Amino acid sequence: MDFSVELDQSPGLAQGEEKMTVVFADGRRDHMRLHEYGRMYAVPGLYEEVVQRRLECASPTVLATALVDEMARHGEGPSALRVLDVGAGNGVVGEELRRRGVKGSFVGIDNEPGAAIAAERDRPGLYVDYLFGELAELSVRSVVAQHNLTGLVGAGALGPGHISASCFDAAWREFPRGAWLAVTMHEDVLMSDGCELGEYIAALRAGGHNTEVIRLNRFRHRLRMSGEPIHYFVMIARRTA
């Protein structure tokens, strides 16, 4: 690793406001926001160093573990699962699923232009296909059919500034009966009155949209740069029709 990172530990910053300075071995200093993923992915190892190690992001591990555990509880092994990974980034979630025995195909999608390049650089061969763009622009039906997909996953992809409820439901309904859903989302999604996405999740929990929610747990997603915890929920569900 030919860089070090200085985190801005100012209190009270929103997730999208957190900043850092990357100091390279040649003396260059690069200032960026944490959510400038394109700039993060351009530096090999930077995302893992900051998000996974320094800020202790647990979403990929929690999502993968919860999904595989629920599959086992329902008498299914993970090996044949074939996954559409939404907001796939440089492949951290896909790698965690692979480590837990998912041997089927992974298809990634991300709206960050540099994500696919970073995923192939950091985790070569993990994805059989990697699509650039918004989920709403993707023909999910054709992708599901082409790769015979049986799972939809997304770590942190749901919430304000990310995928809308209607867009997500349009994608989820293209999956076959018995398909698995695994997502993590900020706790505010479930706790805010009048939130479209929160109302959608509530409908899923009530058995709506041909979905059975079988796990919904709160967990510490990661630390803020100032040290306070950020909490998310992990949801595991199945398609019933």
Question: Model-predicted segments: where are they?
Answer:
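Class I SAM-dependent methyltransferase SAM/SAH-binding core
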Residues: L84, N90-V140
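N-terminal auxiliary segments of SAM/dcSAM-dependent transferases
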Residues: M1-R33
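A short acidic, Gly/Pro-enriched loop at the edge of an enzyme's catalytic core
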Residues: V140-L152
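A short glycine-rich, Lys/Arg-flanked "PGG" loop and its adjoining helix->strand segment in the class I
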Residues: S166-R177
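Class I S-adenosyl-L-methionine
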Residues: G207-A241
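Conserved beta-strand signature within the Rossmann-like core of class I S-adenosyl-L-methionine
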Residues: G178-H186
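A short SAM/SAH-binding and catalytic strip from SAM-dependent methyltransferases
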Residues: L149-S164
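Conserved alpha-helix/loop element of class I SAM-dependent methyltransferases that forms part
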Residues: C57-S79
